[in-house]
Swiss-Prot record:
Belongs to the urease gamma subunit family. Keywords: Cytoplasm, Hydrolase. This is Urease subunit gamma. GO terms for molecular function: nickel cation binding; urease activity. It catalyses: urea + 2 H2O + H(+) = hydrogencarbonate + 2 NH4(+).
Amino acid sequence: MQLTPQEKDKLLIFTAALVAERRKNRGLKLNYPEAVAYISAAILEGARDGNTVAELMSYGTTLLTRDDVMEGIAEMVHEVQVEATFPDGTKLVTVHNPIR
């Protein structure tokens, strides 16, 4: 299987997000990479589902709360940027202050 660098990045994000989701479901608090992967994967999937950039920017702020992450992580994640593939092309989605 031949994958482009972008496809490899998306696969890595998905794998990290899967680990994060399992840990979250077990009641563990997520660390920085897990939180970013969790939000990024949700944005990528939302774009694939046909949501708009504005919808995904809003949706990205609803995925995790301060209770879901380790102490200090919410302050570390100022924004999450994801280059997502939409039906009309690739666009950059930026979620500001995603963990509230």
